[in-house]
A protein has these predicted regions:
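N-terminal helix-turn-helix
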Residues: 1-82
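Short, structured helix-loop boundary elements
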Residues: 4-8, 27, 61, 65, ...
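Amphipathic alpha-helical regulatory segments at dimerization interfaces
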Residues: 17, 33, 84-95, 182, ...
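Short, ordered coil/turn segments that flank beta-strands lining enzyme active or ligand-binding pockets
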Residues: 58, 106, 205-206
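Short loop/turn microsegments at loop-to-beta-strand junctions
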Residues: 59, 100, 197-199
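Amphipathic alpha-helical effector-binding/dimerization core
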Residues: 63-157
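Extended hydrophobic
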Residues: 165-238
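Cysteine/selenocysteine-centered motifs that mediate thiol-based redox chemistry or coordinate metal-sulfur cofactors
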Residues: 238-252
Length: 252
């Protein structure tokens, strides 16, 4: 059964697209990118303009507006936690000489929002703002561990990228199961990035997953006693992120 409302889906897609475009987009560009009619684009834009969720700039481009800010207020503690996390991942990377990143879920995507790298000639974490299918790798498992298996299967079906996880859904369910049971997932199998990774979810005060913290390296970095050490490193990092949020709340 499809319980989704097409008009709402299109509106959300438009907002998500504008979130990726700091300079905004014209009505025609939004129509083309989203595959919707000009009249549908117009009605969505006019509705969002009325509520000041978007604004129309002098160059006829639309961009997000501050009418969205009140919606963020209930999540201020989670945002403070994430802001504190940059210091944590910087320390983790420097002290353990391993790449570390923080990712969040954006609908059907996982997005890198923070990263830290040891002093190496090449980077492993990718650029801040990079996005990948939310079902992919250990990051996906950490971000989705609070979702039902039915929701996860729906995300797998919706994924249009040619991934091992798309072809073999059990890979996703197995990794999610590891997070639920052990608190983390490790991805050592061959993947399109030729890297190994270990991820752990970060939760808010209510227990909801708000981000995933990930260590990235070679397969040998996660072998034997090294893995046990890095599990402890990640657990400590998650704890410090949470402590940072609690400390900020206490200062209010």
């Amino acid at each position: 059964m499809n319980n989704k409302i097409p008009a709402v889906e299109k509106t959300i897609a438009l907002l998500e697209l504008l979130a990726k475009l700091p300079e905004g987009a014209t009505q025609a560009e939004l129509k083309k990118e989203l595959g919707i009619s000009m009249s549908t684009a117009y009605r969505i834009l006019q509705t969002l303009l009325k509520h000041k969720w978007i604004r129309k700039n002098a160059d006829t481009k639309y961009s997000l507006d501050n009418g969205l800010l009140p919606l963020l207020y209930p999540f201020r503690n989670s945002m403070e936690l994430l802001e504190h996390a940059q210091k944590v991942i910087d320390r983790v990377s420097a002290e353990n000489e391993i790449a570390c990143k923080l990712s969040i879920r954006r609908g059907t995507e996982q997005v890198t929002i923070m990263r830290a790298e040891p002093e190496e000639p090449f980077a492993l974490t990718g650029q801040v703002g990079s996005s990948f299918p939310v079902i992919e790798g250990s990051v996906g498992a950490a971000l989705l561990c609070g979702e039902s298996d039915d929701e996860i299967m729906e995300l797998i079906q919706e994924c249009s990228t040619d991934l091992a996880e798309k072809q073999e859904p059990e890979l996703v369910l197995k990794a999610v199961g590891e997070v639920r049971m052990k608190g983390y997932a490790v991805n050592l199998r061959k993947n399109r990035w030729n890297i190994a990774a270990m991820s752990m979810p970060i939760r808010d005060a209510e227990g909801s997953v708000i981000a995933a913290i990930t260590l990235i390296g070679a397969e040998s970095d996660f072998a034997g006693k090294k893995r046990s050490k890095l599990v402890s490193v990640l657990k400590d990092a998650v704890r410090k992120c949470s402590e940072g949020s609690c400390r900020t709340q206490g200062e209010e």
